[in-house]
Amino acid sequence: YAAGSDVDFMAHVVEAVAAREDVCLYPGDWFGFRVGSTHQERIKWEPDSRERLACLCVPSVRNGHLTTEMVGFLEDAGACLLNLNLFPTLSPAERQATAEALTPVLGKSILSISFSRGFGLTASQLGVALVPRHHPYRAKYAQTWEWFTYFFNGIAARAFLALDLDAVAKVDSDRREWVAEWLRSKGLPLIESGSYYVKAFRPAGGEVPEPLRPLTRDGLVRLSLIHI
């Protein structure tokens, strides 16, 4: 399926499920999973996802990683909605390890990809969702999904087939090096692992400087470094 943006499709999925039951977001992960819903009371920031829809960015915008606890969060869930926008920003070795960690949950997962970030087509917000053929949500929502995605499916297919994956990988490699150099130049900790796109820091002494307070949640300062 495809939509005008990945956020459109994810918002529809969360809204449809939250109309019937609770939806779980991993604490500290992406706030965008809930902003389009009219059922805020059913969208929970909690790690206990048993038998419910679990939503997570891969890697998480909490800290730029996919942790063991996050994998457990997905394994316990009845279904998963995975936002893969930042997956290409991991190093090749980490992408391989992350893909292997996700393999057991793919059969129950909806995979959401934004061409604007995940595949570097920054002039487009086009989003694609990959849904297993026998996923239970297809029986419930396929007619609706087909109705509002049919216009974008052909556009998405042509855009994807035109991608030069080697060129995209080169861009990600250059960005990763630029971010590392920027962190060094500012005297900030350099964490080699995880996404170069987002880095999280826990301030020493617990005091957060005033300019960084808007970027702080759950005691972590998060920087989206590609926009600097």
What is each PLM-predicted segment?
Residues 1-226:
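PLP-dependent class I/II
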